[in-house]
From Swiss-Prot:
InterPro entries: Ap4A_hydrolase, Bis(5'-nucleosyl)-tetraP_PrpE, Calcineurin-like_PHP_ApaH, Metallo-depent_PP-like, MPP_PrpE-like. This is Bis(5'-nucleosyl)-tetraphosphatase PrpE [asymmetrical]. CDD domains: MPP_Prp_like. It comes from Bacillus thuringiensis (strain Al Hakam). HAMAP family: PrpE. Belongs to the PrpE family.
Length: 246
């Protein structure tokens, strides 16, 4: 099986359409379909900050749950939206406010439909996908080699948020260790979460979050070819979001 793994979309629907078309997908049915049966995989954070979060929920639900033709691993923004839809007490900030504004503008029956689709998508998707006979892992923020195969709370925190230290940068964002430098496995780990200006290959890991929602690019990794394909963002560039990884 051949996969096209898509970085953090964050509601950037036009960029997602442009990228999939560049990858050879056809949208005539209303969904991206590849003539050679390649499968899409998403590293999570499909919503928040960008203009079309709810449409992205519908598309990914259709591909993953209804048609079972794609793979989705939830991100930290997905986790927060899931908790919001469950009625938990979450702070509507850091991008969630854009998704909530879209949601609250809908009539109640459409709200219920979106809520049910996203809850189903989240609950029926694993923390990370192990594909191609364990040669490929797709997850949101990465995973340590000794965590592969586990699903406990410690692993969930790592997969959703990265290798956080508990410390904060001056802007309030978490300080993260560079786990990829320590990875010694042979399986390729493809992830996003931390915006980088260029796809970052370190050992057998690839960060493909090139900051589409911050004016960078939306990037896909073609597997097993190990080629990256990107399209430019239509949004303003926010340079401070592309923090160097120590």
């Amino acid at each position: 099986m051949k996969y096209d793994i898509i970085g953090d979309i964050h509601g950037c629907l036009q960029e997602f359409q442009n990228l999939t078309e560049k990858l050879g997908y056809n949208w005539s049915s209303g969904l991206p379909v590849h003539p050679d049966q390649r499968k899409l995989a998403f590293v999570g954070d499909i919503t928040d900050r960008g203009p079309h979060s709810l449409r992205m929920i519908e598309i990914v639900w259709e591909l993953v749950i209804h048609k079972k033709e794609a793979y989705y691993a939830p991100g930290n923004h997905c986790n927060k939206l899931y908790r919001f839809f469950l009625g938990r007490n979450v702070t509507v900030a850091h991008g969630l406010e854009t998704t909530v504004a879209e949601y609250e503008a809908l009539p109640s029956h459409k709200q219920n439909m979106i809520k049910e689709k996203f809850i189903t998508l989240y609950e029926q998707s694993p923390l990370y996908h192990v594909l191609d006979e364990k040669r490929l892992l797709v997850c949101h923020a990465g995973i340590r080699q000794d965590y592969i195969g586990r699903q406990d709370k410690k692993v969930q925190t790592f997969v959703l948020y990265g290798d956080i230290t508990g410390e904060k940068h001056a802007d309030g964002s978490p300080v993260r260790r560079d786990w990829a430098k320590e990875y010694k496995g042979t399986a390729w780990i493809v992830y996003g979460h931390t915006p980088v200006k260029e796809p970052r290959f370190v050992n057998h890991t690839v960060n493909i979050d090139t900051g589409a929602v911050f004016g960078g690019r939306l990037t896909a990794l073609r597997y097993p070819e190990m080629e990256t394909v990107s399209v430019p963002s239509s949004l303003p560039f926010v340079p401070e979001k592309f923090r160097p990884i120590s």
